Regions:
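Helix-to-loop junction immediately C-terminal to a conserved catalytic motif
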Residues: 63
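ABC ATPase NBD Q-loop/coupling interface
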Residues: 72-90, 122, 238
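ABC ATPase NBD coupling module
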Residues: 79-96, 117, 243-250
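Conserved ABC ATPase "signature" region
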Residues: 123-141, 193
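Conserved ABC ATPase signature
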Residues: 145-149, 153
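A short, proline-enriched helix->beta-strand linker immediately N-terminal to the Walker B motif
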Residues: 164-168
């Protein structure tokens, strides 16, 4: 995304001094401390940090699954707590490490599940789902069961299920980590393209730094617990090779990688 476009847009999401602690048998543990950042519409943000630093916890808070935090989260300039207290539909989609497709349902029935639950199976929405299946190579498999598809195809189906509800913000929690290396390269690129083609805003949590650099407009680097923001890096790659590893030939790639890698090593 063009940096000037990002600067001039009102944030879709803003975190202000977000802090979160949880209780254990040994007492209170602070997981996140004074986390502040903004995300503009259409921006793809990756969050990286040491294992166990609280990356997934942060996504759970943004998704509304954890509410006992301090600080503020704003969605389109409205505090998230106000929206949640009025049971407002936040239009946030969540994609996890595992696809969570049900094998007793066909691919088509799986991707329509959210629409069924929300009673949104209109002709318009059904046409939209079918167009997504067609566009991303799953239309001919729509009557198959998930067990009949490859891991990469199942992850594409899981993303289409999320897109079917037309969310404004996508939260991606290690969605490629269960895939083998070759499939992961292909699917991460495919899903990155799908998100951009559909003009979605996305936050990706990943342990794979190369993946983060290849997909993101900016990378948020977290410290060890209690996690704070160590650095926010704007990413801009000059890519001339469209192969799955083409981003590594970008002249800026090694500079970004080494810079962020040093930050991560300092935390281990």
């Amino acid at each position: 995304m063009d940096s000037n476009t990002i600067i001039n847009q009102t944030p879709i999401l803003a975190l202000e001094q977000l802090t979160y602690s949880y209780h254990t048998l040994s007492g209170e543990t602070k997981a996140l401390e004074n986390i502040s950042f903004k995300i503009s519409p259409g921006e793809f943000v990756a969050i990286v940090g040491p294992s166990g630093c609280g990356k997934s916890t942060l996504l759970n808070i943004i998704a509304g699954q954890i509410t006992d935090y301090t600080g503020n989260i704003k969605f389109h300039d409205t505090p998230m707590r106000i929206l949640q207290s009025h049971s407002a539909d936040l239009h946030i989609g969540y994609m996890l490490q595992h696809d969570h497709l049900f094998d007793w349902r066909t691919i088509y029935k799986n991707v329509c599940l959210g629409l069924e639950i929300k009673n949104l199976m209109t002709d318009e929405n059904i046409d939209y789902v079918l167009s997504l299946l067609e566009k991303y190579g799953l239309y001919d498999f729509k009557d198959k069961k998930p067990s009949q598809l490859s891991g990469g195809m199942r992850q594409r189906a899981a993303l289409i299920r999320t897109l079917a509800l037309n969310p404004e913000l996508l939260l991606l929690d290690e969605p490629f980590s269960a895939l083998d290396y070759q499939t992961r390269l292909q699917v991460s690129g495919d899903i990155g393209n799908i998100i951009r083609e559909n003009k979605k805003t996305a936050i990706l949590v990943t342990h794979n730094l190369s993946e983060a650099i290849s997909l993101a407009d900016k990378i948020i680097v977290l410290t060890q617990r209690p996690a704070t923001i160590k650095r926010i890096v704007d990413i801009s790659l000059t890519i001339t090779d469209n192969s799955p590893l083409g981003y590594r030939t970008a002249p800026e790639f090694n500079e970004y990688f080494n810079e962020i890698w040093e930050d991560l090593c300092d935390e281990n």
